[in-house]
UniProtKB/Swiss-Prot annotation:
GO cellular component, one term: cytosol
Amino-acid biosynthesis as UniProt keyword: no
Function comment: Member of a network of 50S ribosomal subunit biogenesis factors which assembles along the 30S-50S interface, preventing incorrect 23S rRNA structures from forming. Promotes peptidyl transferase center (PTC) maturation.
Gene Ontology MF term list: ribosome binding; rRNA binding
Gene name for this UniProt entry: darP
InterPro entries in the record: DarP (IPR006839), DarP_sf (IPR023153)
Pfam families, per the entry: DarP
Name of the protein described by the UniProt record: Dual-action ribosomal maturation protein DarP
Presence of keyword RNA-binding: yes
């Protein structure tokens, strides 16, 4: 038996792992599956978008055509197409797509919040009358005071007479126009 020099252990491959600066990051199989499912859900969200919303996203032609195809497919084929879209997303940087989707969702949420605010203002106008008109004048100085008071008067009469709230709808539309002209 031949003796080896004592430094033979230094030449073993893989022994120098602790000397490297690069860390090995172990990712579990279930984490990979969770990420893949998340990307598939992102693809499903994009499939639910309309053509105008898709135009606002910066998508490459292959991904765009896959999404448009998924919009036309029903049942089992759609599931397979969504998996393909998820696979395509794994090969791309999805952060810009996520940001654009968040922007679209946020715009919708802002619009819903604005409508709720306008409904509250309308209800206050009908209930409180002139006090609430002063608040509206503070928000929108260019309000036609006479038209607004006329609508409020009609809305109160309709409410007392249990009639359909036509004037209340007109108040809401008028407030929405004011809000849109402001922004």
């Amino acid at each position: 038996m031949t003796k080896q020099p004592e430094d033979w252990l230094d030449d073993v491959p893989g022994d120098d792992i602790e000397d490297e600066d690069d860390e090995i990051i172990w990712v579990s199989k279930s984490e990979i599956k969770r990420d893949a499912e998340e990307l598939k859900q992102l693809g499903a969200e994009m499939v639910e978008l309309g053509k105008n919303a898709l135009d606002k996203l910066s998508l490459d032609p292959d991904l765009r055509s896959a999404i448009e195809l998924a919009q036309r497919i029903k049942k089992e084929g759609r599931r397979r197409q969504l998996q393909l879209i998820g696979k395509m997303l794994r090969q791309r940087d999805v952060e810009p797509i996520r940001q654009a989707l968040d922007k679209l969702k946020n715009r919708h949420n802002q619009q819903v919040a604005l409508f709720h605010k306008l409904e509250q203002i309308r209800d206050r106008l009908i209930e409180q009358g002139d006090d609430a008109v002063a608040e509206v004048l503070n928000l929108w100085p260019d309000v036609d005071r006479q038209q607004l008071r006329s609508l409020i008067r009609n809305a109160k009469k309709e409410k007392e007479g249990n009639k359909p709230p036509k004037s209340a709808r007109l108040i809401f539309q008028y407030l929405r126009e004011l809000a849109e002209n402001e922004g």
